[in-house]
Amino acid sequence: MQVLHVCSEMFPLLKTGGLADVIGALPAAQIADGVDVRVLLPGFPDIRRGIPDAHVVSRRDTFAGKISLLFGHYNGVGIYLIDAPHLYERPGSPYHDTNLYAYIDNVLRFALLGWVGCEMACGLDPFWRPDVVHAHDWHAGLAPAYLAARGRPAKSVFTVHNLAYQGMFYAKHMDDIELPWSFFNMHGLEFNGQLSFLKAGLYYADHITAVSPTYAREITEPQFAYGMEGLLRQRHLEGRLSGILNGVDEKIWNPESDLLLASRYTRDTLEEKAENKRQLQIAMGLKVNDKVPLFAVVSRLTNQKGLDLVLEALPGLLEQGGQLALLGAGDPVLQEGFLAAAAEHPGQAGVQIGYHEAFSHRIMGGADVILVPSRFEPCGLTQLYGLKYGTLPLVRRTGGLADTVSDSSLENLADGIASGFVFEDSNAWSLLRAIRRAFVLWSRPSLWRFVQRQAMAMDFSWQVAAKSYRELYYRLK
């Protein structure tokens, strides 16, 4: 079984979000599971620099100009790169310029990604041809459409990492991307009078996956589907929509071997975690005190992530004696709110605006509770890192958060399945009730340690996801 992942970024070569983490870990796990997997990426400068052995496999004159297909390796995974400097070698992010304006030719830049994915199934590399083209998010959404236009030379899977991003372009661009105009209708890639790369992936793929079982159910409902609920409900009824939970890259996120921690530990040596807490308290300007629970946030500061709820609930958390360590950036109003709270409560609240991968490890290793109160969360990785590090997640019951964290209720404690704290409603009162439950459990150190060990014993490795994807591919074949 030969599988080609088509996507726009890959950790650690290039990362703007969680998609990169998935592509940075899933292919290697699939190779270990016996699947012949390769990855197709645009030739962005950071990616090119990370694959110095890339050599030319093929050259083509395309609707987006002359390109070369390169092939190399990264960490044992075969990587195809689309070498098109006129499209991909630019300042700014992969998607927008330094002024945060989307590149005006994004329609060509990412249509080309889907087109090359299809051409791989038609023999663009004469020595390797995929049985399954696995496209990720809107950037690769046209790959299933091109495959459909070419008579489906390979099966296709489309994974939704976040349905909110839809890749919308003017209808006139149908003339530019070499897809038939017959595809531009409601039973195709048209959405609200425009061309939607996301809808193309959803409509033409042989199977759709979401990044958690709960999110796969949620996106069939209007409040989560951004207008796509009709199509997704139909795919669900046809058995062509499922959820496969993302995993944790244990080579990077593992408290037993994490060199970014002051003190490494396992579920059997949790007492070693205390030194990480002490160092984190010092780094964040908090009072060094191992008797109070240290709550943490590592997140984009947005309402979607529920950080407005944290800001509203923060006085109640601090009044109970807790501490807060926050690392993140985003909404200026939220940034200012948290900075003001830290200034008002020195020694109790510490805030760092920005994102630093290394410091996020130190927070995960040192905190007692990680807050993930998202309004929606397709999968979420932060809570998985918390479970792995014995930093109990406090989450809202949505998407992947609902699939991965079990509340420390009396019943769950008795059944040995408690792993954190879960609340239902998107309001500060509901969040504060969950925070109160965390304080109650904290007052019972032996129970707290029991839940930590339960959390750390859970298996959210990529090997589990790789097995599920392999079974899906073989069902399609």
Swiss-Prot record:
Catalytic activity: [(1->4)-alpha-D-glucosyl](n) + ADP-alpha-D-glucose = [(1->4)-alpha-D-glucosyl](n+1) + ADP + H(+)
Disulfide bridge positions per record: none
Residues reported in the UniProt entry to bind ADP-alpha-D-glucose: K15
Involved pathway(s): Glycan biosynthesis; glycogen biosynthesis
Pfam families: Glyco_transf_5 (PF08323), Glycos_transf_1 (PF00534)
EC identifiers of the protein: 2.4.1.21
Cellular component per GO, a single term: cytosol
Molecular-function annotations in GO: alpha-1,4-glucan glucosyltransferase (ADP-glucose donor) activity; alpha-1,4-glucan glucosyltransferase (UDP-glucose donor) activity
Keywords on record: Glycogen biosynthesis, Glycosyltransferase, Transferase
UniProt-listed GO biological process terms: glycogen biosynthetic process
Entry function: Synthesizes alpha-1,4-glucan chains using ADP-glucose.
Homology family: Belongs to the glycosyltransferase 1 family. Bacterial/plant glycogen synthase subfamily.
Protein name according to UniProt: Glycogen synthase
Lineage, highest ranks first: Bacteria, Pseudomonadati, Pseudomonadota, Gammaproteobacteria, Enterobacterales
